[in-house]
Amino acid sequence: MGQPAKVLQLFKTLHRTRQQVFKNDKRALEAARVKINEEFKKHKNETSPEKIKEMMKLGSDVELLLRTAVIQGIHTDHDTLQLVPRKDLLTENVPYCDAPTQKQ
C-alpha cells in the first residue's frame, strides 16, 4: 500500500474512532471532526517521507489513545456525572494478588 493510501486510511480510521468515542455528543463530534480535518489539511503538502512517517505515527497514537482512554460522561445533576463506557473499554476485573502462586 502506497503512502497516500496509508494516510487516507489513517484519516478514515480517525474519523471512525471519533464517531464511536463521541457518539451522541454533537459538540465533541464536531470539534474532533474539525481538528482532524484541520491537521490533515495543514500538512497536505508535506513531501518528506520521514516527516510523513512521524506524523502518521502521531496520528496512530492519537487514534489508540482515543479508542482506549477516553470515556464519555453525562451530567445528570449539577454535581453528578454518569459515565458511559464503551464495550471495548470494559475489561475483566482481576483482583490484585500480593502473593502470586507459582506455576507447576
UniProtKB/Swiss-Prot annotation:
Compartments where found: Mitochondrion matrix
Keyword Endoplasmic reticulum in annotation: no
GO cellular component, one term: mitochondrial matrix
Function statement: Assembly factor required for Rieske Fe-S protein UQCRFS1 incorporation into the cytochrome b-c1 (CIII) complex. Functions as a chaperone, binding to this subunit within the mitochondrial matrix and stabilizing it prior to its translocation and insertion into the late CIII dimeric intermediate within the mitochondrial inner membrane.
Membership in a protein family: Belongs to the complex I LYR family.
Chain positions found as Phosphoserine: S60
CDD domains xref list: Complex1_LYR_LYRM7
Keyword Chloroplast: no
Name used for this protein in its record: Complex III assembly factor LYRM7
Superkingdom: Eukaryota
GO BP field: cellular respiration; mitochondrial respiratory chain complex III assembly
Keyword set, alphabetical order: Chaperone, Mitochondrion, Phosphoprotein
Subunit comment: Interacts with UQCRFS1.
